[in-house]
Amino acid sequence: MVVSDNAQLVNFREICSGSIAPGMLYRSSHPIKDNKQEKIISMLANKARIAAVINLCDFNSGIYSKAFFAPWYNRLLKNRLVIALGMDFSVTSNSFKRKLKKALKFIINTKGPWLIHCHAGIYRTGFVCMVLESFMGAALDEVINDYLLSFNSIFESSIYATQKADSQAAMRILSVMSESMTINEQNLKQIAETYLQKTIGLSVKEIELLKNKLSGTY
């Protein structure tokens, strides 16, 4: 099995659409499952030189016992380079918005490459990545296709196989950023930036810092 197949197995891939710098941002499923490290993710994370992790699914109270099983992850955690946010699945909830702001400020205040993950690397990770890709100027079809790619992954178990996703479903999720405005190729980037400023609450300065971090110009 080649590395690309292994990466697909655990939903590990680079995000390099729009002006996101090569080798700067990655996504995956959880690096530690059932008290065992995912060896494929460990290998790929080391190869990518992951320097900080945004964990969308665990709480601080649980991540320390898990991290013990993955030395690279545990090292980052001890150096305060892992943020555990315990996000729910409701991307419109106030709790989700507050935690997304924490995730973005974590990126601003750390150095990449960054890895974003939840449990399966599909829903919560998918939404956060759509926001960042849109914000950094990715084409609409790139954003949608990246979200859907996780559903086509070999990683999908029977649990996820029953939850079919298509481009219309992805657009509905993406439209969370736009409120009542229809998203299109021309307004996607501006909608994402407005969402980060007005809904998530980043300042103008923080938005510029986030752009610089993701584009590798900091």
Q: Where are the regions that the model predicts?
A:
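Cys-dependent protein tyrosine phosphatase-like superfamily
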Residues: 1-115, 127-218
